[in-house]
């Protein structure tokens, strides 16, 4: 006799980590910058193995010092400095954070090397901060030169905060540059804003499980009375895909086939772009009578 398994309902979009945990991925040849409070813990996971990590720390006094982690340096931080001198995205974020806090990359002169080229996959090193500090975890390595040695690989950093986030408190990703404007769009509402050529627009689902509609119009033509927005047919035809995505096929076009927007990053990956807006009938048929919907909004 086959005994059926007890199944649990699956609720997509719920946070996988607790209110005191944060998960970061350190790209090969990249870094991640952490702001730590007293009592915060973090661990570095060597995902594929054979990957060295370098740990740099700034104390609350602004000095490059590993004492907040109760560690003594065994290296001079050159590997991390070389990474931060590049135009790699995580390096720009680190430089932005350090600049706002008044720290200089040139002041990095102490670090500790974690793991080695012989470290096994999923090896873990754990640390705890006893003071306010800024820590940089980097995954140094050469480019993929297969005839010399293994290429650099990713590291995972999991932070356990001493203070849990309160209900309604959210954690935002680090901005690349100083934000020009931040808009909090409340539920059931919409917001309009004007951007210049070259500006970046970042839409963040703060709490998860929230759909959003995005529309764009050419401001100059709109002032002339021409309402030219994102065109479904031209965007799909010129990009050769159901919806644009980062990479070669990344642009949205208007009715005259002029490029309007380019997708730079997409952590969702699946969208109902150019789909029909939801209506009250859609929810009525499902039994949710009077549910707010895009068409009524």
Regions found by a protein language model. Give the residues of each.
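Intrinsically disordered, low-complexity segments enriched in small/polar residues
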Residues: 1-297
